[in-house]
Swiss-Prot record:
UniProt record, GO biological process: translation
Protein name: Large ribosomal subunit protein bL28
Gene behind this protein: rpmB
Disulfide bonds: none
Family: Belongs to the bacterial ribosomal protein bL28 family.
Entry-linked SUPFAM superfamilies: L28p-like
């Protein structure tokens, strides 16, 4: 199952999870030190939604991110779908 947004193209990113030790300088310590670094993935908030398209006069079932859902609220579904098709998502 793909974890990519159909409207914005957001997909999982790679990064690190840091293990930190020490007492912060604010608490009169010598500062926080990174003692370990583990690879991890950051996943977008993808959900399956049924949205009504006025142009096609039917429901569209899309896997979209929370950011795309806010875009749909702001611009309307048909405009966001047209933008996604032009960008190739």
């Amino acid at each position: 199952m793909s974890k990519k947004c159909a409207l914005t193209g957001r997909k999982p990113r790679r990064g690190y999870s840091y293990a930190i030790r020490g007492i912060s300088k604010k608490k009169k310590g010598i500062g926080l030190k990174v003692t370990g670094r583990t690879k991890r993935r950051f996943f977008p908030n993808i959900m399956t939604k049924r949205l009504w398209s006025t142009e096609e006069n039917r429901f569209l079932k899309l896997k979209i991110s929370a950011a795309a859902l806010r875009l749909v609220d702001k611009l309307g579904l048909d405009q966001v779908v047209a933008r996604a098709k032009s960008k190739g998502f």
